[in-house]
Each structure stands twice: as C-alpha cells, then as structure tokens.
Design a protein with these regions (language model features):
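Nuclease catalytic cores that cleave nucleic-acid phosphodiester bonds
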Residues: 99-245
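Domain-level signal for Mg2+-assisted phosphodiester chemistry and nucleotide/NA-binding surfaces
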Residues: 2-131, 143, 147, 202, ...
Length: 245
C-alpha cells in the first residue's frame, strides 16, 4: 500500500445528505441560478477535499412533479436524477402534493365563511389578503385561484437516514446540505448517538452563501458556506430540458 493510498484511507469518512430544493433556493438567492445546474457529487467532493475528508456516499433528496403537474420539470428531474444515479449518487424522490391557494387583491372585502357558525365580517387591510383553504366565499373583489405544488417529508427522510447511518457508524462526518432548522433535532440526536456509542460524529451544515452572516442548521458543529467560485467549478453543462441529451 502506497503512503498516498494509506493517507486517503485514514481520512474521516463523510456522507453527504443533500436537500435538493433547499440547495436550489439558496443558489437562486445567492447566485441567481434558477434550477439545479450543478453536479452534486462533484460539489460534495469539493467540500470534502477542502476539509480533508473522504466522501463515501452522496444522497440526494427532492420532490418531483408528475406529468400532469408540470411536464417540463418532470422531464428535467427524470433526466437529472438518472444522470445522478449513473454518477453513483443515491437519489430519493417523492411526489409533490397539490395545494389550492386563493388570493384576493382588494383592501376592503366582505368575507362570508362557509361555516355558518362563523359570522360574516368586513376585513379592512392595506395589504393583499390570503383566503384560507377552509372554504371562504367572497361577496366582493377579485379572487385568484392557484394550485401550488409543495414538498412534504424531505426533512424527515434526511433526518431518519442520517440518524440510521450514525447508529450503524457509517460515517465520521455528516454533511447536511441544508439550512432547514427542522433538522436541528436530528443533529442533536446524532451527537447523542455518538456519545452513547463512544464515537465522535461531526455534523456540518453546508449551503451556498455569499454572506458570512448566514446561519445554517442550529446545533451543527460546523457551518460551511459554499462561495460562488467553488459552486461554479461544479456546474453541469448538460441541458436536461431538451428531449434528447
């Protein structure tokens, strides 16, 4: 065994748990990108190489629309996830949930609830009012109905898998590519698992950021802010919106 090979094998093992939509939103806010245009495994490798960790697995979680919900994005995600799997990434995809949202754009609106136990009332506000999903009927004003597709359970899946990997001692470093505070209890539990098993796990919250003041997941041991220079080195040049790559 060469000294270089031995040195690599002795590096702390890292597993990347990537919240796809969280990563996209941060990249959009910070760098102006409107879709997932990077090689996620290359990004995880870049983070590990910078910190002298050995990446042993990359797991990517996202919600995917159906053909009926959005055929364009369905095609994109089918091709993108297929390429990830070819690259050795473990992909975990879930269906998006439909949610009907109604928005009213008037300041003075008489609102009558469908539930007769609630009396009619006049709302006076200086900002647009949101109509809840409990069946309110509007006597006046324009109502805009819109179906939005929401992602459910991604944070739970990441939390469960990250804790399972800790119990099985499959990593030394848990890389959570997310800033979702809902993952904070899982971070605490991973640390507790480490204490009970006499193992020391390092949990890092990783996200694109151009500002040093951005906060990641509470209770994480380390915050890693990905600068645009690192992000851009991991760009994926393939066009997954085309019918044929």
């Amino acid at each position: 065994m060469s000294p270089l090979t031995q040195d690599i094998e002795e590096l702390p093992r890292a597993v990347a748990f990537i919240d796809g939509q969280n990563l996209i939103h941060d990249a959009t806010r910070e760098f102006g990108y409107d879709h997932l245009n990077i090689d996620v495994k290359k990004l995880a490798l870049s983070v590990c190489e910078t910190n002298r960790w050995k990446l042993t697995e990359t797991r990517f979680y996202t919600g995917v629309p159906t053909l009926q919900q959005n055929p364009t994005w369905k095609q994109f995600w089918d091709k993108k996830l297929f390429q990830m799997r070819l690259d050795g990434v473990q992909t975990i995809a879930s269906k998006l949930k439909d949610r009907e949202t109604q928005i009213i754009l008037y300041k003075h609106i008489r609102v009558t609830a469908s539930d007769s136990s609630i009396e009619s009332q006049t709302l006076i506000d200086t900002s647009p009012c949101w109509v809840t999903d409990r069946g309110y009927c509007l006597d006046h004003g324009t109502v805009i109905s819109q179906t939005v597709f929401t992602e459910k359970g991604i944070d739970v899946s990441i939390a469960v898998d990250a804790m399972k990997y800790a119990l099985e001692s499959l990593y030394d470093v848990c890389l959570m590519f997310s800033r979702d505070s809902d993952l904070s209890p899982a971070v605490v539990e991973i640390k507790n698992i480490g204490i009970k098993s006499q193992s020391k796990f390092l949990v890092a919250t990783v996200f694109p950021s151009s500002k040093g003041s951005d906060y990641g997941i509470p209770h994480a041991d380390l915050t890693i802010r990905i600068p645009k220079s690192m992000y851009d080195k991991c760009l994926d040049s393939k066009d997954y919106f085309r019918r044929k790559l």
